[in-house]
């Protein structure tokens, strides 16, 4: 982690010479929970919920009674 912190405690986006403060490789892997993991879990949850809706829409189709 960089020791350069702003008045609110956040790390600045850029260093004084213009370079990024955090390397692009680490932007997706730092933090409490990696963003790619949250996005993957969210995507799976959306597919699951849509699957339940599609399953429910076809239940009873073709049933004679």
UniProtKB/Swiss-Prot annotation:
InterPro entries: PSII_PsbJ, PSII_PsbJ_sf. GO terms for cellular component: photosystem II reaction center; plasma membrane-derived thylakoid membrane. It is a single-pass membrane protein. Keywords: Membrane, Photosynthesis, Photosystem II, Reaction center, Thylakoid, Transmembrane, Transmembrane helix. One of its GO terms (biological process) is photosynthesis. The chain crosses the membrane at residues 35-55. It comes from the Bacteria. SUPFAM superfamilies: Photosystem II reaction center protein J, PsbJ (SSF161021). It is found in: Cellular thylakoid membrane. Belongs to the PsbJ family. PSII is composed of 1 copy each of membrane proteins PsbA, PsbB, PsbC, PsbD, PsbE, PsbF, PsbH, PsbI, PsbJ, PsbK, PsbL, PsbM, PsbT, PsbX, PsbY, Psb30/Ycf12, peripheral proteins PsbO, CyanoQ (PsbQ), PsbU, PsbV and a large number of cofactors. It forms dimeric complexes. One of the components of the core complex of photosystem II (PSII). PSII is a light-driven water:plastoquinone oxidoreductase that uses light energy to abstract electrons from H(2)O, generating O(2) and a proton gradient subsequently used for ATP formation. It consists of a core antenna complex that captures photons, and an electron transfer chain that converts photonic excitation into a charge separation. This is Photosystem II reaction center protein J. It comes from Prochlorococcus marinus (strain MIT 9301). The gene is psbJ.
């Amino acid at each position: 982690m960089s020791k350069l912190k702003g008045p609110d405690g956040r790390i600045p986006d850029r260093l004084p010479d213009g370079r990024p403060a955090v390397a692009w490789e680490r932007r997706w892997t730092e933090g409490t929970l990696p963003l790619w993991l949250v996005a993957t879990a969210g995507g799976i949850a959306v597919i699951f919920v849509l699957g339940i809706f599609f399953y429910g829409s076809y239940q009873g189709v073709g049933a004679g009674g």
